[in-house]
Regions:
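Catalytic loop of short-chain dehydrogenase/reductase
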Residues: 2-59, 69, 82
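C-terminal helical subdomain
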Residues: 59-63, 67-68, 75, 79-125
Length: 125
């Protein structure tokens, strides 16, 4: 990110989308039980995204930093029986990489960054 931040800020356009997981939430359903190392690593990713977004002005410098939960997708990790295809799991990441952003936007969705997203919605963590 250090290498990419300056050119993205200069161009006033850029998106950093980091894959995480809803299992890294600190609140909400399914936030306890099993997979502790995985959960803790994803909680760390979510915290990193939040902090990087704040350090870069929450979009005011021209680029966004967000985390995405791709859900249980058919990948090497998700396995062949996962309910979503890899393409379906990637839809929110693609949306984040291409979405419009307005720091002064009229809706909350227009000006959110530094959060965890799932199915194009913010996931409280």
């Amino acid at each position: 990110l250090n290498i990419l931040a300056a050119p993205m800020a200069e161009a006033r356009a850029g998106r950093v989308v980091i894959f995480s997981a809803c299992l890294g939430r600190m609140s909400g359903p399914g936030n306890t039980g099993g997979l502790a190392p995985y959960r803790v690593s994803k909680a760390g990713v979510n915290a990193l995204v939040r902090n990087l977004a704040h350090e870069t002005g929450l979009g005011a410098r021209g680029f966004l930093v967000d985390a995405v939960c791709p859900n249980h997708s058919r990948t090497d990790m998700g396995g062949p029986d996962a309910p979503l295809s890899a393409a379906e799991g990637a839809q929110t990441a693609i949306w984040l990489a291409t979405r419009a952003f307005d720091v002064n936007g009229s809706s909350e969705g227009d000006k959110l960054t530094g959060v965890l997203w799932e199915e194009m919605k913010v996931v409280p963590w």
